[in-house]
C-alpha cells in the first residue's frame, strides 16, 4: 500500500519562478519612473527600493509612494503610476512556471496522488500567479498564510493542510525551496520533507538542512523520491 498520499508544494520558486521575475520587474519599474521624469539616477533609486522592500516586505502596497519620500522628492502620482504599470506589465509578461513543474504535476495526478499548496504571502497575489499559469485544477486545497492568519514555519498552517486532506503527517510530503519555513516547519509536524534547492534561497538557512529528508535540484526528481518512499529501492539523484 502507498505510504505517501499527499504532496504539498510551496509556490514561489518551487512551482512559480518568481525570484528572477521580481528583480526584472523592479528594475523596469524604476526605469519607467525615470523615463517619465523622476529626477534620480537608476542606481540610487533601485538601491533605495531594495532597502524599502527589505524593511517593509515584498507585499507592502506602497513601495513606489514611499520611494519618493525616501528620495526626498515631492509626491507625483504620474511617477508612481509609471512604476506600478511597468512592474505589473513585466510580471504578467514574464510569469513562468519553474522548469518541469507542469510535467511533474501531470504525472502526480496520473498516478493518483493528491496535491496541495502551502504558501506565505498575499492571497490575491498568490492566487493571481496560480490562475494566470492555469495551475489551479491540479490542487484540491491551497493554504495561503495571510488568509489563514499564520505563517510558515508555524505548525498550525501545516496541521490545517493535513486536516483538509484527512491524512496523517507521515502520509504527506512537503516540497519547498526554503529550509526554515518549508522544510523545518513541515518536519516539526512529522511530515516527510523535500528541499528543492532552487532560486535565491538555495544557499540560505543551511543550518536547517538536517531537516530535509531529500534534496532535489529539478522538480521531476520528486518522482524518484516518491518511488523510494513507496517501496522502490531506486536512489534519488540530485545534480547539486
Curated annotation (Swiss-Prot):
GO annotation terms (biological process): small molecule biosynthetic process
Keywords attached to this entry: Hydrolase, Magnesium, Metal-binding
Cofactor dependency: Mg(2+)
Highest taxon in the source lineage: Archaea
GO MF assignments: metal ion binding; phosphatase activity
Enzyme Commission number, as recorded: 3.1.3.-
SUPFAM superfamilies reported in the protein's UniProt record: HAD-like (SSF56784)
Pfam families registered for this protein in UniProt: Hydrolase (PF00702)
Class of enzymatic activity (EC top level): hydrolase
Disulphide bonds in the chain: none
Family matches, as InterPro entries: HAD-like_hydrolase (IPR051400), HAD-like_sf (IPR036412), HAD-SF_hydro_IA (IPR006439), HAD-SF_hydro_IA_CTE7 (IPR011950), HAD-SF_hydro_IIIA (IPR006549), HAD_sf (IPR023214)
Family to which this protein belongs: Belongs to the HAD-like hydrolase superfamily.
Function statement: Catalyzes the dephosphorylation of D,L-glyceraldehyde 3-phosphate in vitro.
Annotated NCBIfam families: CTE7 (TIGR02253), HAD-SF-IA-v1 (TIGR01549), HAD-SF-IA-v3 (TIGR01509), HAD-SF-IIIA (TIGR01662)
Protein name as annotated: Glyceraldehyde 3-phosphate phosphatase
Amino acid at each position: 500500500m502507498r505510504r505517501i498520499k499527499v504532496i504539498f508544494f510551496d509556490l514561489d520558486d518551487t512551482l512559480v519562478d518568481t525570484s528572477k521575475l521580481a528583480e526584472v520587474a523592479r528594475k523596469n519599474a524604476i526605469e519607467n519612473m525615470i523615463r517619465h521624469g523622476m529626477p534620480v539616477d537608476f542606481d540610487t533609486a533601485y538601491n533605495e527600493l531594495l532597502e524599502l522592500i527589505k524593511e517593509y516586505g515584498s507585499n507592502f502596497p506602497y513601495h513606489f509612494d514611499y520611494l519618493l519620500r525616501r528620495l526626498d522628492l515631492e509626491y507625483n502620482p504620474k511617477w508612481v503610476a509609471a512604476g506600478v504599470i511597468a512592474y505589473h506589465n513585466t510580471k504578467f509578461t514574464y510569469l513562468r512556471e519553474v522548469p518541469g513543474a507542469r510535467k511533474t504535476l501531470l504525472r502526480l495526478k496520473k498516478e493518483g496522488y493528491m496535491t496541495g499548496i502551502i504558501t506565505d504571502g498575499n492571497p490575491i497575489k498568490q492566487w493571481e500567479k496560480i490562475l494566470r499559469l492555469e495551475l489551479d485544477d491540479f490542487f484540491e486545497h491551497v493554504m495561503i498564510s495571510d488568509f489563514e492568519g499564520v505563517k510558515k514555519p508555524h505548525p498550525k498552517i501545516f496541521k490545517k493542510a493535513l486536516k483538509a486532506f484527512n491524512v496523517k503527517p507521515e502520509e504527506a510530503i512537503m516540497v519547498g525551496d526554503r529550509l526554515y519555513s518549508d522544510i523545518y516547519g513541515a518536519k516539526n509536524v512529522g511530515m516527510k520533507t523535500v528541499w528543492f534547492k532552487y532560486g535565491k534561497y538555495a544557499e540560505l538557512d543551511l543550518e536547517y538542512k538536517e531537516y530535509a529528508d531529500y534534496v532535489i535540484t529539478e522538480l521531476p526528481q520528486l518522482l524518484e523520491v516518491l518511488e523510494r518512499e513507496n517501496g522502490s529501492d531506486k536512489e534519488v539523484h540530485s545534480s547539486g
